[in-house]
Amino acid sequence: MATETETVVEETEESVQQIPMIEANGLSKFYGIFAATREVSFKVFKGEVVAFLGPNGAGKSTTMKILTGYLSPSQGVARIAGFDMNTDRLAGSRKLGYLPETGPLYPEMTPYSLLDFFAEARGMNKATKRYRIEKAVDLCALNSVIYKPINKLSKGYRQRVGMAQALIHEPDVLILDEPTSGLDPNQIRGVRQTMKRLGQEKTILLSTHILQEVEAMADRVVMINEGRKVYDGKLEDIDPTHQGLDAVFANLTGLDAETGVKLDNEIDED
């Protein structure tokens, strides 16, 4: 029989587990009469890897920019680790690592000098910088290229450098926008391996329009189409009739999973 102390500890751990590390609450973004997103709501909890899936033009990047504080919502609230990213962005940013689709890389720098620059900008002392850089380099498997100019690296390695930059301050939350975009199969495998390592200790939201990425890296999927959320659930629950994820995606969005085409209309780029 559990003691009173053990019961309190279990309840405390359970309550911590239920605090959302990423929260989108009714997020809408309007440009004149055009709505990039409409009332998008979802939560990502500690230890989850969640795929944010949708065709190009669905509103994924807009939602991620709002979640990271780079864009203010027209309506709704975005929170990181409980901090409102519109009114308390600095506190939220300390908990957040963000990799946009085009990462903040300086081609003339080496991965080491870039990471040192970002660590310095975050006010780390010499010992902390050394430790954080070594840890980020190990997590992202950059040891073999750490002193090579970034403009000499493959796109796969540049993507890993971007991830290392997002990790330099040891954030609890990672938001990654199309982390495998434009990579070849070998580079994609490398990024997937990095994601598996990171998923053991971080809360991760990654956007993608590639169904295979969801199956390879995520525990749960949030699906968006035409600016609206159309699905939010566990991977094991999304396909109870075993049609395959392609068929489920087509049923929910009305789009062909491979071409992104609805009837005869091309989907615009995000």
Where are the language model's segments positioned?
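Catalytic Walker B motif of ABC-type/P-loop ATPase nucleotide-binding domains
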Residues: 174-178
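A short, surface-exposed alpha-helical micro-motif characterized by mixed small hydrophobic
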Residues: 214-216
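A short, proline-enriched helix->beta-strand linker immediately N-terminal to the Walker B motif
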Residues: 168-172, 201
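Conserved ABC ATPase "signature" region
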Residues: 116, 120, 127-145
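Helical segment within the ABC ATPase nucleotide-binding domain
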Residues: 188-200
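ABC ATPase "signature
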Residues: 232-233
